[in-house]
Each structure stands twice: as C-alpha cells, then as structure tokens.
C-alpha cells in the first residue's frame, strides 16, 4: 500500500484505454504508452469501438485484458487500475479500483478489495469534489473539462471545477479529466491542475509513445 501511495503521489499522467479488441494490439499499445510516460493505466471498455463491434466485454475477456495491462504496468513501474468492477480488480490483483458516483460505496469496495488497493472516485460538481477530497478515497478526479464521447450526455462543468479543486489546496492527489489533449493541456494547467486523465489523446494517436511523451513532458515542466 505504501509503495502504491508513493507511486500515486508522483503520478501525473493517467490513461484510460479500452481492450482494443478491434485492433488486437493491447499489449503493444500498453507498452508504448507506458514507455512514453504514462503513470497509471486503466481498463475501461464501456462504449468502446470493440464493444460496438463485438458486444460488452465478458468477465473472462476483461480479466485477460487486465492481466496484459497489469503485466505491462509492473514492468514499467506504473499503476494498473480497474474501472467499476471490484470483483475484477480483486481477481486481477489491480493496484487501483476507480469508482463513479453511482458505483459501489467506497466502504463496501474497501471491504471487498482489501486494505492494499488504492481507491479513486469521480466527481462532477463542487459538492462531490469536496466530499471526495475529505473522504476515504485515495485520489479523485474532477470533470469533465470538455464534453467527451466517453461520457455521452454528461454536462461538462468545465475548467471552473478544476479551478475550484486547485483552491482546495488538498494534499490528496487529484486529476482533471474529460476531453484533455496536448492542445488543451495548457488551459488545464493554467486552471491549476497538475495531474490529468486522458483517453483519445493517446488511444487514437498514430504513435502512442510520442503522444504520451509530449503530455508527460508538459506536465513535468509545470510542476
């Protein structure tokens, strides 16, 4: 737990990726992204091209994808995260379980995954953000900064919520999320974030390692 917390505290670039079933290159992609500077890599297949083509990811296949990402994360000294599924997180030996506002309560998740797995929580308004900062989550995310196809129909609170998070001056790690890419990153940094979650900025890149490197370098320069 202590090593995971130390890795989380130093983390700046958090990547959510699907299982890349339509491409069949998850292992190669993960290695490239992590080599480029990704600090946390999370499997999130909801709404992915693979889901649209092949249907929802079955638990057995999700666990297999988790094993690929967990192995890559270990080799690169990064953290591996599972989205929503406490059972998959436990079975896969994940470092992190990330939960949304409608997912398992943190206390229930903690009892299920044990004391050593880090817990993250999404927040979408000031009240949720303040509760996440004060509560038992090990880190929290704020956003979306911009509308994103990853969360269709969800209003984006924008950079105002990022500014509010920065004004909390909390010692707990937090990440800005939602529509962030290399072009928008300077605005996010100006709003006070020093950690970000990205999806398409790396998953859609022709060169995932270079895309990750560009983001990681910009985040490092802003410390």
Curated annotation (Swiss-Prot):
Catalytic activity, as annotated: 2-[(2R,5Z)-2-carboxy-4-methylthiazol-5(2H)-ylidene]ethyl phosphate + 4-amino-2-methyl-5-(diphosphooxymethyl)pyrimidine + 2 H(+) = thiamine phosphate + CO2 + diphosphate; 2-(2-carboxy-4-methylthiazol-5-yl)ethyl phosphate + 4-amino-2-methyl-5-(diphosphooxymethyl)pyrimidine + 2 H(+) = thiamine phosphate + CO2 + diphosphate; 4-methyl-5-(2-phosphooxyethyl)-thiazole + 4-amino-2-methyl-5-(diphosphooxymethyl)pyrimidine + H(+) = thiamine phosphate + diphosphate
EC number: 2.5.1.3
Keyword Signal: no
Gene Ontology biological-process entries: thiamine biosynthetic process; thiamine diphosphate biosynthetic process
GO molecular function, one term: thiamine-phosphate diphosphorylase activity
GO CC term (a single one): cytoplasm
Keywords linked to the UniProt accession: Magnesium, Metal-binding, Thiamine biosynthesis, Transferase
Binding site for 2-[(2R,5Z)-2-carboxy-4-methylthiazol-5(2H)-ylidene]ethyl phosphate: 148-150, 179
List of residues binding Mg(2+): 84, 103
Spans traversing the lipid bilayer: none
UniProt-listed SUPFAM superfamilies: Thiamin phosphate synthase (SSF51391)
Pathway(s) the chain acts in: Cofactor biosynthesis; thiamine diphosphate biosynthesis; thiamine phosphate from 4-amino-2-methyl-5-diphosphomethylpyrimidine and 4-methyl-5-(2-phosphoethyl)-thiazole: step 1/1
Entries under NCBIfam families matching the protein: thiE (TIGR00693)
Free-text function comment from the UniProt entry: Condenses 4-methyl-5-(beta-hydroxyethyl)thiazole monophosphate (THZ-P) and 2-methyl-4-amino-5-hydroxymethyl pyrimidine pyrophosphate (HMP-PP) to form thiamine monophosphate (TMP).
Protein name (Swiss-Prot/TrEMBL): Thiamine-phosphate synthase
Gene name tied to this protein: thiE
């Amino acid at each position: 737990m202590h090593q995971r917390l130390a890795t989380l505290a130093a983390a700046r670039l958090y990547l959510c990726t699907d299982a890349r079933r339509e491409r069949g290159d998850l292992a190669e992609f993960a290695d490239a992204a992590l080599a480029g500077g990704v600090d946390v890599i999370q499997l999130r297949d909801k709404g992915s091209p693979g889901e649209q083509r092949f249907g929802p990811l079955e638990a057995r296949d999700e666990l297999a994808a988790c094993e690929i990402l967990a192995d890559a994360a270990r080799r690169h000294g990064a953290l591996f995260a599972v989205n929503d599924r406490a059972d998959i997180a436990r079975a896969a030996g994940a470092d992190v379980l990330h939960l949304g506002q409608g997912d398992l309560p943190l206390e229930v998740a903690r009892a299920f995954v044990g004391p050593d797995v880090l817990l993250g929580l999404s927040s979408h308004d000031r009240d949720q953000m303040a509760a996440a900062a004060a509560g038992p989550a090990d880190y929290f995310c704020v956003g979306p900064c911009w509308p994103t196809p990853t969360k269709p129909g969800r209003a984006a609170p924008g950079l105002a919520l990022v500014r509010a998070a920065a004004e909390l001056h909390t010692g707990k790690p937090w990440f800005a999320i939602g529509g962030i890419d290399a072009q928008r990153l300077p605005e996010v940094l100006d709003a006070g974030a020093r950690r970000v979650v990205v999806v398409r900025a790396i998953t859609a890149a022709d060169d995932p390692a270079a895309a990750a490197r560009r983001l990681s370098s910009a985040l490092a320069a802003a410390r």
